[in-house]
Amino acid sequence: MRPGGERPVEGGACNGRSELELLKLRSAECIDEAAERLGALSRAIWSQPELAYEEHHAHRVLTHFFEREPPAASWAVQPHYQLPTAFRAEWEPPEARAPSATPRPLHLGFLCEYDALPGIGHACGHNLIAEVGAAAALGVRGALEGLPRPPPPVKVVVLGTPAEEDGGGKIDLIEAGAFTNLDVVFMAHPSQENAAYLPDMAEHDVTVKYYGKASHSASYPWEGLNALDAAVLAYNNLSVFRQQMKPTWRVHGIIKNGGVKPNIIPSYSELIYYFRAPSMKELQVLTKKAEDCFRAAALASGCTVEIKGGAHDYYNVLPNKSLWKAYMENGRKLGIEFISEDTMLNGPSGSTDFGNVSFVVPGIHPYFHIGSNALNHTEQYTEAAGSQEAQFYTLRTAKALAMTALDVIFKPELLEGIREDFKLKLQEEQFVNAVE
């Protein structure tokens, strides 16, 4: 180990640049060399949007990309990894493939998303997420392959993770053990700004059904039990409750079913609600209070109520300051202008199943500008995500991720800091590290 805490990189320094800096430049060159193939990959996914768990075309495009990526057979691809539309592609230096290879390779994961939204296609730019993950992995592999001597033991893993928008494919993969051996994970999400981190919130969704009794609305309404009244009461209960909600809590919902005809007392109604909070602990408090509002509406209307939570809760994304600082340092060298840390920590955010990943393995989920001020989940953002202009920003972000991954490989003190940040955040959240 050399004085700066870096592992030596074979090949020497040149023109005053460190060996690691030269390796980072090579990773960026590898991404540029693959730019045409990566852009075609993104366009193929964007042009045929598919909903959660139904991403068969995108899955086929991505697995074929890695199966055919030169040099031949450099990636070991498992095309239907734990889920029908998930995949796993692995690369490691030939020396590390020997049964006697020691020590255990460092496993770095790059995540791809590729599901779309109903009606408006890739309005969240998941085609670009897939491209970033693939490009960053190619950059790391290309840089390490160019070393004249074997690199440190490392395995590059690309995980295709379906169903982020609905269902939580990453949570399914966590439960199947897909993240068990990964040391650090990387992905990036398109947005309106460049942020190394945003405080994505914990989220719980719920379907509420009220059962009443039908009757003629004019002739004998007193014989009925109005399930729509129960739904309206529930909606109003939550509206009143907002006065006591913390400013960081979010509650939003719709009445999905409110009856069939005005002259029939509705015997059935249905609501769908999403609850969000900065932490799982706060989310549990919010959910309990909201469910009390639903039950009170049933009591007042004489109806019965059924409250059913979604298949998975999305956890809040744990920040990893060591990792995001390394990413910002690399990004700035590429010309990325990041929002301030204060704006980053207090800015608006949504929810993602990457939050669940961040509770089992340290990782980074930065956001990147794609050359448009359009807002996510709009038709305008769909257009922007498929534009040629977005390609420059997407590949620049992939380069920053690849460079950060190289820092993790060659700077042991950075990896130590990442792991320490991870443990401290888990302790703050009062969660046990599922990896250990």
Swiss-Prot record:
GO cellular component, one term: nucleoplasm
Keywords: Carboxypeptidase, Hydrolase, Protease
GO annotation, biological process: proteolysis; regulation of protein metabolic process
Catalytic activity: beta-alanyl-L-lysine + H2O = beta-alanine + L-lysine; beta-alanyl-L-ornithine + H2O = beta-alanine + L-ornithine; N(2)-(4-aminobutanoyl)-L-lysine + H2O = 4-aminobutanoate + L-lysine; N(2)-(4-aminobutanoyl)-L-ornithine + H2O = 4-aminobutanoate + L-ornithine
GO function term, MF aspect, one: carboxypeptidase activity
EC number(s) given by UniProt: 3.4.13.4
Top-level taxonomic group: Eukaryota
Family: Belongs to the peptidase M20A family.
Function per UniProt: Catalyzes the peptide bond hydrolysis in dipeptides having basic amino acids lysine, ornithine or arginine at C-terminus. Postulated to function in a metabolite repair mechanism by eliminating alternate dipeptide by-products formed during carnosine synthesis.
Name of the protein described by the UniProt record: Xaa-Arg dipeptidase
